[in-house]
């Protein structure tokens, strides 16, 4: 790892790199932009949340208030500008107030939960995956009380995306499913992924037209899968470079999908038809 953040200009295909703190590799893992254009990232090896100002290159560090929380993992902003994040090995979920720099942490009830992907629903409630268990969970944004939702025993959820009407889609990394969770009723549905039980579904997103997209990282080459919630039909295509494990992906407002091909040093884009 190079201890840098990278910026891609989609119009030119040019990259610009921003070096982070000197010395120990901070292990930048998840990142998200705020409304002012700052880039916030989880220093998975450094035990802090970082903020990069791309205009100046300045990096501000917000250290974790607990030594146990040494591996912040995935981050997301809610509508109020609060940054929520998972701490995988530390088994916690946290929130950071950018105005004050204050960080609050809450331990997940199951000590082997391995909190992973996290997203915010339309009501402002963070929902996250427990990769180490067969559970999803939500955290009350005011009290930080955690509610868990049990999934079938074989399931290990890794990442998630949420529809406009708050249906949670998640990738079942262990047993090869695309799943849905209704957090109001607790109802769960599983759809076998086209690549089979060892397809290791991973990164996932939902485009503005309601289509669900995710990657299968256990097949070679990696695939991109489209799921239509209305017809419940799948479409599937290989990633030309092989993918090298697509750990995350994001949909833009105009329907493009950017994928991080972590093992082949590439960023890919899927254009709408």
Per-range role (PLM):
Residues 3-7, 47-51, 91-95, 135-138, ...:
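A short loop-to-beta-strand structural motif that recurs across blades of beta-propeller domains
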Residues 1, 39-45, 83-89, 126-132, ...:
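Conserved beta-strand positions in repeat-built beta-propeller and related beta-rich domains
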Residues 23-36, 67-80, 110-123, 129, ...:
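Beta-rich, blade/repeat-based domains predominating
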Residues 244-273:
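Blade-level signature of beta-propeller repeat domains, shared across WD40, Kelch, NHL, RCC1
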Residues 14, 36-38, 58, 66, ...:
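Tandem repeat domain/solenoid detector
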